[in-house]
Amino acid sequence: MKKAFSLILALALALCCFSFTASADEAPVVLTVAVSDGTNIEDFNTNEMTLYIEEKLGVDLQITAYDSSEYDSKINIMINAGDKLEDIIVGGLGGDAAIFDYAQQGAIIPLTEYYYNPEIAVNLTEAIERVGFDFRGAMTMPDGEIYGIASLNQSWGNEYGNGRAWVYTPWLEALGATAPTTTAELEALLEKAVATDLNGNGQKDEIGLAGYDGISGQWFNWLMNAFTYCNNQKGWMQVNDGVVSFAYTTDEWRQGIEYIRGLMAKGLIPTENLTQDLATGYTGMVNTEDVTCFMVGYTNADRMTDIERKGLYTAVLPVTGPNGNRTTMFSQSVPSTGMVITADCENPEMAFRVGDLMVCEELSITTRFGKKGVEWDYVSELENGSDYECPYSPHFPPFIALYHDSQYWGSGAMQNVSWMQKNPFIRQYGIAAGMAYAAGTMTQFDLEFANGATLYQTAGLTPKETVQKLIYSAEEQQIVTDVKTDLNTYIKETNAAWLTGAQELNDDTWNAYLKTIESMNAAEWLKVAQAAYDRSVGK
């Protein structure tokens, strides 16, 4: 083989990554690969992960790294021009609709037969056991075929990450209050917070609930879920008895708007929540010392830079509304496409085995966390494993010991160990939730974040039916595209006008709003969404 290979790396990985082993007497199978470049990846062709795959499978991966800023469009142009393609194209290529379109053009091939052959899909089959559900259904296109190797990161912390509320505990204690459980209790607490000089600076600058991005913001989702299920990331769609509809056309939505408008009218929620963005206004707001009572976001005190103060925010569950509704937005960990195999590939089974090997547990960890024995180790393999602790215990035991993750992943430093998640990977909940740290090194922030994630995961406030992953055909996607932008703009602007009081919300304006939505072909979007949803649940 033309490239040198580290025997130590091979031995370290061979125990956990399953595949057939190529004969040393056979010439390597040449496979060309297209991938988007990475500023912190030295050379894909000499990368340790590449070398391991080549040695294990008896292949010669000839990799071309394209400019990441134009990668998807580059591939699209090549396909539409009928150009010869690399055997393997790594990446999501613009999403499911684009991938299905490429399949319909004959540019990429179905992999379904390989997926359902456990002798070929060795690691994918094992991954189904690891993650606890058969993700092949979520990879299946409208024609019943699977066209990509899956990428999946199950994250205990991410699934409710955009809908968690956090309260500043020193203020809660100063007010002699407890976490609110109803919309009425929340309003009363916010009234006390903004009326009291809690930070002791003699100014009336206390903020009840900080947020950004208007009705697309996390703060709005959290409040509206006291009235009806609300998830802007899924187009504000909800499902009742198998029927997909828009939350923003319901009477409960109107009640929620009236409630939130009342909070804004009293100055309990700043109107800046409707106009400011994350990078500027919101970040500046929450980094003004001791001014914010409530925040809603991925982490406790999201975007706050003071790590000690962040640790003083604790998670609060959604409140119950006057009609008894109490739900929380939920974004399930679902697979996406990590790579496809083109019709130009002369050995598609071997190309599939490359993707299959990439998703084995150890390579899936390596592509994110770095080199085993240097950046991380399995806690179970350490003599001093009991010295490591995990903030998610007892729900998840310590699984991987991390030594300097911020230097490997967060620094942007050049490395040649892994593909930095450019490739397919599959990680179960226990990996991210089982990240372990040397005893005594976890911060209060780490603990509060884990407690918040666990609180929402175990509360049981997710509706039985929700929209998660909708795979559209190219024709269906065009219908969505034609309707979505203008409709969403109208929804945002009209609801913002009601929330600020710029427009009165009454029967006349509400009915006019519903008629306008109807005139903008919302029903056409719902029709294709319903079809995609039915496919996703096997109808």
Language-model features, listed with the residues they occupy:
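Positively charged n-region of N-terminal signal peptides that target proteins for export
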Residues: 1-9
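Conserved N-terminal structural module of periplasmic/extracytoplasmic solute-binding proteins
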Residues: 6, 19-188, 231-236, 244-248, ...
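Bacterial N-terminal signal peptides
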Residues: 8-17
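Loop/turn elements at helix/coil->beta-strand transitions in domains of secreted/extracellular proteins
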Residues: 27-31, 57-61, 82-87, 105-109, ...
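Conserved small-residue motifs centered on glycine
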Residues: 36, 363-496
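Secretory-pathway/luminal and periplasmic proteins that interact with or process carbohydrate-rich
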Residues: 84, 97-101, 194-203, 215-223, ...
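Extracytoplasmic/periplasmic substrate-binding proteins
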Residues: 100, 212-236, 261-426
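Helix-loop-helix "hinge/cap" segment bordering the ligand-binding cleft or interdomain interface
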Residues: 112, 141-218, 238-284, 339-374, ...
